[in-house]
UniProtKB/Swiss-Prot annotation:
Residue stretches spanning the membrane: none
PANTHER family: ATP-DEPENDENT (S)-NAD(P)H-HYDRATE DEHYDRATASE (PTHR12592:SF0), ATP-DEPENDENT (S)-NAD(P)H-HYDRATE DEHYDRATASE FAMILY MEMBER (PTHR12592)
One Pfam family of this chain: Carb_kinase
Keyword terms: ATP-binding, Lyase, NAD, NADP, Nucleotide-binding, Phosphoprotein
Protein name: ATP-dependent (S)-NAD(P)H-hydrate dehydratase
GO biological process: metabolite repair; nicotinamide nucleotide metabolic process
GO terms of molecular function: ATP binding; ATP-dependent NAD(P)H-hydrate dehydratase activity
EC numbers for this chain: 4.2.1.93
Domain spans labelled YjeF C-terminal: 98-402
Cofactor(s), by name: Mg(2+)
Enzyme class name: lyase
InterPro entries, A to Z: Carbohydrate_kinase_pred_CS (IPR017953), CARKD (IPR000631), Ribokinase-like (IPR029056)
Amino acid sequence: MFCIIHFGNPKNDKFLGSSTLYSQKLKTNNIKILCLQVFYYNIYESTNNNNNNKNKNKTLLLNNIRTYSTLSKGALSTTTTATTKKMSMDDSFELPTNLNHFLSYVPSLEYHMHKGQCGRIGVFGGSAEYTGAPFFAGITSLRLGADIVHIFAPSEGGTATAIKTLSPELIVHPLDQQMDPSTIIPWLLSIHVLIIGPGLGRSSIAWKSAKEVIKAARNINLPMVLDGDALRLICEDLELVKGYDKVILTPNFVEYRALSDAAKKLNNDNSNNILSPSDLAKALGNVVIVQKGQEDIITDGTISYSCDKAGMPRRCGGQGDVLAGVIGTFYAWTQNALKGKTSEELEHLKESIGENQSAAASAAYAGCVLVRYAAKLAFKNNRRSTITDDIIKSVPNALVWGFLTDDRGRPTI
């Protein structure tokens, strides 16, 4: 049991010094009180100013205590005033029953398999300001179980070099100053899914290149996940994705509103209403929409899912990039599960997943569920200090314990 203590109302810094980080464990009736990140605070006040007695009769001044455990009665001195706030975080997880069919898409690991069969993912994005975004999406894909990830990022500002440095396991393709799409397009035939947008920025050069890449990907029927600034880009030309049922759009609140306005303009709708996710998906020709928020709504206009499982209250930059990487990988798995199957095998798969299930929508829904669970695990261990890297490190456990356990709760391969 432990308490996190915040000391307030500093009078001076005699005891700590002006910038000392004070960490000390105090044992009080089997409760460990952990003092963290205390600056400019006078922790002890002597009842006697005599230097010879400065270490005697010290009184611990507790201005406020926030605890994640219930304090035992009488554990603190009766002379100490404290307020407590109980907070708990259960790490249990139960896969939603309407996702059971998704397990049919998850590839089994076999010794005869070769590299690439569990997913080859492409990520196009990054800029001088946002180097981390494509890295987060790419490394999440690898941690989830994709075999190969290609990152297409600009050389300008050292973006591509920085990503290479962050992970030698990512295959990084530096783009020239014009971000020539001809550097990317030849690789599209060798990947299963292309994620466009993480950290892309809004420069005219980046957008021009992204438009050409989207067109090329659509021409070869390549599944895509569009996130971040790629969503802003298509708001200027919705025909880039309209009617393409192999694209998943993952807007946050602001991006969703922009997409809704663009769709209404395209369809001559002058109302002030924001389109529902289902109506937006239909207006764009049944693309898959993932409306991110406190409750994620996933729909292709025909079938809809909602994900309101508890994640974490902490918000840190990069969570959307993690989600894009997870959805991209799950989408690749669904597509690969359908490839090379005989008509009899496809019929059996259709029976196991259900007649009306959308592979793309299922992948997006499963991605939302998994990322929330990973965030929950990360927050349990790191609390307020949780960063995106902590969530990524929790992805493997979220996958195994959330999705890949047998009836006895044992992890499957």
